[in-house]
Amino acid sequence: MPKRRLDPLPSAAFQILLSLAGEDLHGYGIMRQVVEQTEGRMRLGPGTLYSSIRTLLEAKLIQEVDQLEDVKLGHERRRYYRLTSAGRKLACSEAERLADLLRPARTKKILRGRYV
């Protein structure tokens, strides 16, 4: 995979990694989690979601896992995704990079309230 696709990490890919930091999720679950964790500021459509998932899978930042509970409950097999250790490390690095970018805004008192 060409490095340029993940350097810097696109916002959609970062949000997908964050959504998988707590639990394994299927595509629709990732879409809902991204809306929740961004308080509605970001919504991933199916095209963006699945092209980002494909890129993250190819880079081994996430992996596909089976969820037998869905089958037991009579649901169609869904593709679930899990954050890999490399994905967690990249999410941490990206969060630190973003925090560093915001430091001047905090220092200059541009950010207020909950952002400080």
List where the protein language model places each region.
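Exposed loop/turn and edge beta-strand positions of beta-sandwich/beta-sheet ligand-binding modules
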Residues: 77
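Amphipathic alpha-helical dimerization/coiled-coil segments
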Residues: 1, 86-116
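Basic amphipathic alpha-helical segments that dock to polyanions
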Residues: 49-56
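Basic, short loop/linker segments at the boundary and entry of helix-turn-helix/winged-helix-like folds
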Residues: 1-9, 81
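N-terminal helix-turn-helix DNA-binding core of bacterial DNA-binding proteins
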Residues: 6-48
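Beta-hairpin "wing" of winged helix-turn-helix
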Residues: 57-74, 82
